[in-house]
């Protein structure tokens, strides 16, 4: 009985071996046939869809980080002013994003990316004008959101410089002007095909001065524009009551919470990792990833150097380190490196941050004591002056 079973099992194994030997070469042939199949157009389209999807997600993620800078600005401004005016400042920061977003979508976006040398032809509700700008397949609506948060950043810079003495109704008027005219025109000149034409060889700058204008993420377009508007606004409004004595000397009006201000700077620092690296607008290729990583590094180094050298300069100048000036030094370094963060070396980023941190200290002193312009948060020095220091030509 055992012999019979053994023979039966041997026959079964032989049958299985025969089947495997017969089918195995066929599977190899089938694999060879598959490997020789050419890549179809549908495969290329699928790859392009993945690339576009990654780029879109990166752009929208960066937009969310920049949007998160709004509470950062609100906390910095609230911390640097007196308690009684906190609600007013917070309301202004809220309204300039809400109101400004609608205005920029309705008018500003068309002015910024329309056709023209000095100003774009407006296209109300017509997002098709972006076909000539978006050359990597990014959705137009997504790019609109990305530019909207940049516009909101330019608008909210002014709020702090004019704090504690601006009527809410007049602030609404200002929001209209910067959202539908000032920022769109500034952006059109540089990023929308205007006369500066960011980095283009045949631009007005090249033809007249023999060099190109480079502003990667908005050191001039966003921060410098907002900073100079802040300076003019503060000068027109005049100082707060009690800021200057009868002899003309400046009197300190301390803010009510450096804790809020410090938290706000950390939030802004975090949001800047969307502001600068996000301006690459793509993250799918190796080149994009290299640029993004480099911009992350230069942005962080400039912030650290700006804060450190502002701390050192304030310590030497006033005999003790100043937290408020150190916080503004961090922001000064971030603003300064924004234009050329994609081009400068890490050492160059440290130098830019150091210069901006030191210049900011003396700029605040000059505006306060010499020009006698009352800027409670130092916005004109941080954004206006330092925004001019790193424009790449």
Language-model-derived ranges and their functions:
Residues 1-12:
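N-terminal secretory signal peptides that target proteins for export/translocation
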Residues 12-20, 25-392:
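Hydrophobic alpha-helical transmembrane bundles of multi-pass membrane proteins
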């Amino acid at each position: 009985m055992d012999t019979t079973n053994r023979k039966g099992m041997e026959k079964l194994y032989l049958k299985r071996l025969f089947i495997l030997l017969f089918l195995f070469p066929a599977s190899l042939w089938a694999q060879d046939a598959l490997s020789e199949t050419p890549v179809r157009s549908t495969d290329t389209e699928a790859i392009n869809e993945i690339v576009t999807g990654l780029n879109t997600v990166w752009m929208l993620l960066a937009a969310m980080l920049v949007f998160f800078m709004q509470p950062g600005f609100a906390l910095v401004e609230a911390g640097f002013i007196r308690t009684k005016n906190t609600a007013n400042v917070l309301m202004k920061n809220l309204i300039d994003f809400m109101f400004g977003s609608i205005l920029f979508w309705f008018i500003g976006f068309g002015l910024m990316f329309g056709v023209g040398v000095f100003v774009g032809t407006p296209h109300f509700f017509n997002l098709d004008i972006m076909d000539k700008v978006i050359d990597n397949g990014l959705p137009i609506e997504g790019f609109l959101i990305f530019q909207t948060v940049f516009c909101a950043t330019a608008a909210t810079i002014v709020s702090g410089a004019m704090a504690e003495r601006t009527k809410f109704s007049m602030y609404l008027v200002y929001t209209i002007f910067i959202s539908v005219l000032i920022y769109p025109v500034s952006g059109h000149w540089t990023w929308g095909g205007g006369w500066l034409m960011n980095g283009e060889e045949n631009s007005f700058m090249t033809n007249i001065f023999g060099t190109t204008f480079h502003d990667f993420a908005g050191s001039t377009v966003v921060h410098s524009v907002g900073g100079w508007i802040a300076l003019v606004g503060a000068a027109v409004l005049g100082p707060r009551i009690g800021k200057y004595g009868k002899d003309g000397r400046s009197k300190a009006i301390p803010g009510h919470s450096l804790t809020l201000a410090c938290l706000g700077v950390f939030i802004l620092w975090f949001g800047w990792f969307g502001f600068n690296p996000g301006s690459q607008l793509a993250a799918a290729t190796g080149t994009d990833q290299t640029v993004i990583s480099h911009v992350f590094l230069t942005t962080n180094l400039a912030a650290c150097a700006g804060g450190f050298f502002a701390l050192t300069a304030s310590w030497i100048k006033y005999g003790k380190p100043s937290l408020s000036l150190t916080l503004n030094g961090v922001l000064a370094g971030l603003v300064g490196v924004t234009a050329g963060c994609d081009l400068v070396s890490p050492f160059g980023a440290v130098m830019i941050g150091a210069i901006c941190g030191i210049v900011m200290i003396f700029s605040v002193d000059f505006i306060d004591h010499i020009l006698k312009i009352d800027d409670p948060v130092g916005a004109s020095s941080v954004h206006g002056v330092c925004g001019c220091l790193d424009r790449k030509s």
